[in-house]
Every structure is written in C-alpha cells, then in structure tokens.
C-alpha cells in the first residue's frame, strides 16, 4: 500500500511555497568565503567541475542525548565515533542476516573508516538541535521504505528505485561511498551519479519553472548566481521519490560555493510544510577526489529482480501450504526419514 498525499492539500501547499519569499537561514551568513585562487571557468564564473564526495561518519541527525552538543572534542569525540561505528556495523549485520531481501555486498562497509566532519555531531545545522522537525505525516513517510523492506513484494513496483535500476543519485547530495561528477557550461550545471546512473541537468538562466502539474523523479531545478554562490531551487518532485519523508510539497534550495581547488561548500534547505514543522538545513564540504569513476553496472542486467520476486512467490506458497495443514513449519511435515518439503523453482517438493 502506498502512503499517498491528499493531493488537493499538496497543491495548495505547493502554490503557497512557490509564491512565498523564502527567508535566508541564519547559517548562510556563516558560510566560508572563497579563496583568491579558487578555480574559475573560462567565462568568469566559479568552476564546479570535478569529482566530488562527502566521506564522513558524522550522521545526518544528531543522536539523542547530543541535542545541545553541536561539536565534540577529545576523548568524547573518539567515544562518539566508536559508538557510531559500532551501531553502523551492528545495523549492517542485522540487515544482511535478516529474513528480508537486502544487501549491498558490503560496499558501504568502507564508510566506518571515515572520520567525523570537523568534530560535528550532525550534518543538520538548523534547527539548533541537529534533528529533523517531523510532522506525524513526515515521520510516517520516512518509516515507510524500511517497513516495506520487511514485506513480501507483489511486483517490482514494491521495491526501491535503485533496486529496479531506474534511479540512484538524486538531489540533495549526501554522504555516500559513490562520488558525484560535475560538468559545467555557461548556462547549465550537470551533476552525474554513477550509482544507478542518475544525471541531473540544471539550467542557469531565466527560463521559468515547469508547470506544477508535471512531477519528475529528481524534480525540476533552476540555478541563479548570488555573487560567487550558485543557488539551485528545485521543486516538482514525484512524491514517490521521497527524501526523509518529504512529499509532493517538497521544495529544495541548494547553495554551491567553490572555496579552493580541493573544496566545494554545499548546503541545502528543505521546505515541506506537510512533512516538517519548519524548514531544516544541512551543510558540509565536498572534497575533490581527482579519482576516476568506474561503471556502476546495476545488478549486471538486473538479474536479481526476477530472483527476488520468484523467492517472494515461494515464500507465499510456503505460507499457504503451512496454513492449509495447520502446521507451524515445513519441518513438522516429516514422514519418518527426516525429510521435509522444500521449494524448488517455485514448486513444493519432498
């Protein structure tokens, strides 16, 4: 079951947000200034071209008990990092050993070796608690994908977009073992994620936004310059491409500032009055890796999806068989030689 919006309310909220003048968050004033030798394009604007990545163990939200500690130092920082590493490994082990279709082949294991970001306890900088201000609807939306992972899928539509090899990288940028490649022209910025080949094309000109009735998986973005900072406003997101519980009312404002050769300052603010009680903001530096990117061959032709769905049908058949004979499990069905029914190619056998 898909947790949908009240579309009439969502449209009203979208119109209000589009018409409103968005206040600039207080943290914008504290952004670092570009160095004198920060790279620029041949046409004079700051250059964002390169391969960029955020590699850190600092969590998006501040853990409970740290709401009044935006930064942490010394032995406390070491203990905090070890706590994050332990929780990450335990969560990954639990997911890979659970009776659900989940796994990344250990690709995210490398994240645990990353340090804290400037001794911060969260990437969220506003609200000051470092936590996302959910409404009940937003909290329900955010929990839906993880709950659906526990369910037997009826079809591919019940699985995540990246599992279906349809969409991987999207906005906003976030910490990831997979970098993003930026390409730039005088009137466009292109952000390419090799992870499931997500490519976002951002016009930098005066063209109007597309009609609000048109929704896209990665939204529709428009860029404009605020001094040496590129401001990207994105809306028209398909509500199924939710970010932290967002819906059709999502409006995203991102700010990119090239600080020096190795650093691109990135910040974004999330607006969605249906999912959040107030706007919330994140900021962090992206690092120029200067490393080559390699093809992300999604499931090498997505062979995993038919196997996953056939396994789901076998699970259903097993449950129906057990229920029909009022058995607790197949192991109770024993003819004396220790054999029990099994499932092969979706058929019951002994």
Predicted regions and their residues:
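N-terminal secretory signal peptides that target proteins for export/translocation
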Residues: 1-10
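Bacterial N-terminal signal peptides
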Residues: 13-23
């Amino acid at each position: 079951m898909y947790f949908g919006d009240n579309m009439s309310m969502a449209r009203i909220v979208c119109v209000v947000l589009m018409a409103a003048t968005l206040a600039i968050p207080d943290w914008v004033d504290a952004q670092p200034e570009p160095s004198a030798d920060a790279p620029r394009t041949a046409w004079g604007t700051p250059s964002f071209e390169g391969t960029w990545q955020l590699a850190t163990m600092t969590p998006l939200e501040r853990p409970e008990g740290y709401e009044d500690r935006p930064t942490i130092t010394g032995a406390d920082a070491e203990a905090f990092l070890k706590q994050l590493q332990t929780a990450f490994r335990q969560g990954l082990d639990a997911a890979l050993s659970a009776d659900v279709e989940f796994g990344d082949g250990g690709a995210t294991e490398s994240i645990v070796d990353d340090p804290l970001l400037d001794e911060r306890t969260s990437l969220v900088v506003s609200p000051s608690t470092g936590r996302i201000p959910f409404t009940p609807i937003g909290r329900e939306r955010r929990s839906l994908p993880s709950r659906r992972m526990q369910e037997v899928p009826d079809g591919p539509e019940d699985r995540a977009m990246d599992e279906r090899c349809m969409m991987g990288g999207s906005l906003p940028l976030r910490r990831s073992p997979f970098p993003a490649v930026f390409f730039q022209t005088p009137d466009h910025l292109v952000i390419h994620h090799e992870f499931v080949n997500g490519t976002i094309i951002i016009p930098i000109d005066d063209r109007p936004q597309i009609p609000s009735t048109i929704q896209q998986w990665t939204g529709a973005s428009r860029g404009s310059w605020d001094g040496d900072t590129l401001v990207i406003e994105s809306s028209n997101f398909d509500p199924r491409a939710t970010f932290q519980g967002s819906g059709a009312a999502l409006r995203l404002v991102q700010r990119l500032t090239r600080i020096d050769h190795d650093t691109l300052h990135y910040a974004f603010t999330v607006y969605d009055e249906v999912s959040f009680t107030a706007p919330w903001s994140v900021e962090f530096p992206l690092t120029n890796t200067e490393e080559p990117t390699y093809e992300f061959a999604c499931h090498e032709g997505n062979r995993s999806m038919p196997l996953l769905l056939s396994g789901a049908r076998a699970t259903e058949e097993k449950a129906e068989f057990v229920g029909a004979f009022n058995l607790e499990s197949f192991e109770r069905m024993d003819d004396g030689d220790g054999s029990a029914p099994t499932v092969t190619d979706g058929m019951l056998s002994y």
